[in-house]
C-alpha cells in the first residue's frame, strides 16, 4: 500500500479489548489487491494494561495462515518476546477481547537491507513475509 492508501486505512486509534489505543502511523505497513487489505501498525501501549503482551495492531480482510496459525478475516493484536539471538516468539490475540489465538516463531532474516518496525511484503504465489525489525515469519493467503 502506498502512503495515501495507508492514511485512509490505518485508524488513528485501534480498537483493542476495551480501549481505543493510539497508533504510530510512521510504522504502518500494508498490502492490498484493490479490494482486500492486510495491514499492521505499532500501537502506543504506555498507560494501558498491555503488560508487554501486545505491541502491534493487525487487520486482515482475508483468511491467512501466519506460521502455523490460521487467522480468519478480522482484527488482531500481537506482541513478541525474544527467545534468543536468532528467534522471537510472536503471540497473536483477538483485538476485540484479548483471547489468545496462538504463537509462532520469527527468525532472524539473514539478507542485508533496511530494517523496519513492521513490514508486510506483498505475496508471491500466495506466500509472503512479515518483518518485525530484523526478524521474519511467513504468511500464506488461504482461500
Predicted regions and their residues:
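Primarily secretory-pathway and cell-envelope proteins
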Residues: 1-49, 98-143
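Mid-length scaffold segments of soluble, non-membrane domains
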Residues: 46-97
Amino acid at each position: 500500500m502506498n502512503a495515501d492508501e495507508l492514511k485512509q486505512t490505518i485508524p488513528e486509534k485501534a480498537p483493542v479489548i476495551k480501549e481505543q489505543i493510539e497508533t504510530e502511523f510512521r510504522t504502518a505497513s500494508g498490502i492490498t489487491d484493490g479490494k482486500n487489505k492486510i495491514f499492521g501498525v505499532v500501537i502506543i501501549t504506555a498507560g494501558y494494561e498491555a503488560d508487554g503482551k501486545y505491541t502491534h495492531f493487525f487487520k486482515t480482510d482475508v483468511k491467512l495462515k501466519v506460521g502455523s496459525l490460521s487467522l480468519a478475516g478480522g482484527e488482531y493484536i500481537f506482541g513478541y518476546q525474544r527467545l534468543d539471538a536468532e528467534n522471537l516468539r510472536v503471540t497473536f490475540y483477538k483485538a476485540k477481547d484479548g483471547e489468545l489465538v496462538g504463537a509462532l516463531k520469527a527468525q532472524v532474516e539473514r539478507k542485508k537491507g533496511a530494517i523496519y518496525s513492521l513490514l508486510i511484503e506483498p505475496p508471491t504465489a500466495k506466500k509472503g513475509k512479515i518483518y518485525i525489525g530484523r526478524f521474519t515469519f511467513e504468511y500464506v493467503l488461504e482461500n
